[in-house]
């Protein structure tokens, strides 16, 4: 058995001009139909924008979907609801880090584990300074009011790690004066316990959100236990009509166990800090232009401590470095006609060791009759080599260059029946070069990290939702991914179909997820196909008490996502929600 204890501390402080005012949403004169509020997003524009004006696709998972999923982690919810997105798992709860870990997030075949996908909380990047990957166990459901997923490169606005896309967790807040407290608790299979307590306050210009959680499980295998506790706090104050000041802290501590030999532990203390300034303005009718400046410093110190053998009690440095990134960008949106919006952006990004990268993007959004939308875009994504690739372990190479790719995309969507029926289709092609991979050293013996990889992915994504009546609704999504060079944890086919029922005191939802062509190994090739059936139900006893239950993998499918780590068969959880 091997256990890792990982504390994660994320701090944020921001001062916003214009954020305290009532949002001024963009409107179109083409149609008088009312569009849903979840079409207003902040990801992909740095300000509140009607998603119809953007030439890129942003998927939104709202608070209602998050709560009905009854999951302590956001990532399984995103796997169901967002086409093209997949998250690896190894057990009933928890992801861990390092050897045997899961929580790898991939979007269209590009993975956050290789720093090609960015996760943000309220627009602040969240990734390890040395290893460059997101910390999957830090993204818990109690944080989110909604999650916005930009499917495709977002490097113009967000820089290096947004090469494949962005997941932005928008945190909760009170809209009106008052106090709201919510307790969620449940117990189930394999001695699994999940708890969460959230308090939200708004009084005049002051607002706060304070949350805490404790989760643990014995796991479905010997030495697969997991324990996690953490908290989140956010304080805000409206200084003036157009000025908001807020600060937040997110602390997560988890103990992750997994089978394996005892080896010398790897310890590290990494950091990531920075400043992001931007100003969004309108100069004339139909115009919006954003100027921005970013500075980030990341790095850290990692070392091995020997616990046995002739070197017992000593340590050896692996890396002690830091790097800086400095960037400026401009993002332009212009309504050319009532039926056409033009988008363009350019970023100039300088890395203290690697050099300067120019990052353009361009797109068109056509607003057609019958609430149809057609979007076309071409955007560049890039990422700098991370410290691990340049300086750690025998394959390291300090002369690595940035990876880069182009994403070409065509998207069509429509709302029918006064918005009760919505559907969309995306076609995309990704062409990338200089991908970092470990290959035989051309100038000597052994292996070396090199810019020798290529990526050529193409696919189609479909999603639809239909509100049948005030009691019934159905939704689904499908994605097909063709990879010239297959990678692990990016399924060829991913399908989800779900339905929900709400009447009186009852809320019931169920869904089927089909995964096919999931590579768990590439040499030799091993793929997995499986079908998962989940069922969730909530009964409202009174205004302050709900009783809930959920079952996962009710077909008791035998499958693996991480090679060598079989997933649990059918599991059941039940619990209560208190609202006061």
Explain the meaning of each model-derived region.
Residues 7, 20, 236-239, 376, ...:
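Conserved C-terminal beta-signal and adjacent last beta-strands/turns
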Residues 22-67, 75:
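Short, acidic, small-residue-rich periplasmic hinge/interaction motif at the N-terminus
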Residues 124-151:
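Short acidic/polar hinge/loop motifs at secondary-structure boundaries
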Residues 154, 166, 170-201, 212, ...:
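Short strand-turn segments of transmembrane beta-barrel domains in outer membranes
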Residues 205-206, 297-304, 367, 373-375, ...:
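Membrane-embedded beta-barrel scaffold of Gram-negative outer-membrane proteins
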Residues 217-230, 238-272:
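Flexible loop and strand-edge segments within Gram-negative outer membrane beta-barrel domains
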Residues 335-338, 429-431, 450-518, 546, ...:
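Gram-negative outer-membrane beta-barrel transporters
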């Amino acid at each position: 058995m091997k256990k890792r204890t990982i504390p994660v501390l994320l701090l944020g402080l921001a001062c916003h001009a214009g954020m305290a005012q009532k949002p001024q949403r963009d409107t179109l004169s083409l149609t008088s139909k009312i569009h849903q509020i979840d079409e207003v997003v902040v990801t992909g524009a740095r300000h509140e924008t009607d998603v119809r004006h953007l030439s890129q696709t942003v998927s939104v998972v709202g608070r209602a979907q998050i709560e009905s999923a009854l999951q302590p982690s956001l990532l399984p919810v995103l796997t169901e609801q967002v086409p093209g997105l997949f998250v690896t798992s190894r057990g009933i709860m928890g992801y861990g880090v390092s050897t045997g870990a899961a929580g790898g997030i991939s979007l269209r075949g590009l993975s956050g584990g290789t720093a090609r996908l960015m996760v943000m909380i309220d627009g602040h990047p969240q990734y390890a300074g040395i290893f460059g990957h997101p910390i999957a166990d830090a993204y818990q459901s109690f944080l989110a009011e909604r999650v916005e997923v930009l499917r495709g490169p977002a490097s113009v606005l967000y820089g290096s790690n947004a090469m494949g896309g962005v997941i932005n967790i928008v945190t909760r807040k009170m809209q009106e004066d008052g106090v709201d407290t919510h307790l969620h608790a449940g117990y189930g299979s394999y001695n699994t316990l999940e708890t969460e307590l959230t308090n939200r306050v708004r009084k005049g210009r002051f607002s706060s959100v304070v949350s805490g959680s404790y989760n643990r499980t014995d796991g479905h295998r010997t030495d697969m236990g997991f324990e996690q506790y953490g908290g989140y706090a956010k304080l805000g104050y409206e200084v003036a009509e157009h000025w908001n000041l807020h600060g937040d802290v997110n602390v997560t501590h988890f103990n992750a166990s997994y089978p394996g030999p005892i080896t010398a532990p790897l310890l590290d203390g990494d950091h990531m800090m920075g400043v992001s300034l931007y100003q969004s303005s309108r100069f004339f009718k139909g115009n919006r232009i954003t100027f921005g400046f970013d500075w980030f410093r990341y790095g850290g110190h990692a070392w091995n401590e020997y616990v046995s053998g002739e070197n017992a009690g000593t340590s050896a440095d692996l890396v002690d470095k830091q790097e800086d990134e400095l960037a400026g960008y401009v993002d332009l949106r212009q309504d050319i006609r009532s039926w056409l919006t033009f988008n363009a952006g350019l970023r100039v990004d300088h890395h203290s060791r690697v050099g300067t990268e120019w990052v353009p993007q361009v797109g068109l959004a056509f607003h057609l009759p019958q609430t149809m939308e057609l979007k076309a875009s071409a955007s560049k994504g890039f990422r700098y080599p991370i410290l691990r690739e340049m300086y750690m372990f025998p394959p390291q190479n300090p002369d690595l260059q940035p990876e880069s790719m182009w994403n070409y995309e065509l998207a069509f969507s429509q709302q029918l029946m006064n918005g009760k029926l919505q559907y969309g289709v995306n076609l995309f092609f990704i062409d990338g070069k200089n991908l970092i991979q470990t290959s035989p050293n051309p100038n000597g013996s052994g292996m070396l990290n090199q810019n020798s990889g290529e990526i050529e992915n193409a696919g189609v994504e479909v999603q639809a939702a239909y509100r049948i009546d005030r009691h019934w609704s159905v939704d689904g999504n499908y994605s097909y991914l063709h990879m010239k060079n297959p990678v692990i944890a990016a399924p060829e086919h991913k399908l989800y179909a779900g339905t929900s029922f709400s009447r009186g005191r009852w809320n019931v939802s169920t869904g089927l997820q089909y995964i096919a062509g999931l590579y768990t190994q590439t040499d030799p090739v091993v793929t997995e196909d499986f079908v998962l059936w989940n069922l969730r139900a909530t009964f409202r006893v009174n205004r302050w008490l709900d009783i809930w239950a959920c079952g996962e993998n009710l077909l008791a499918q035998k499958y693996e996502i991480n090679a060598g780590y079989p997933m649990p068969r059918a599991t059941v959880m039940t619990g209560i929600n208190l609202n006061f």
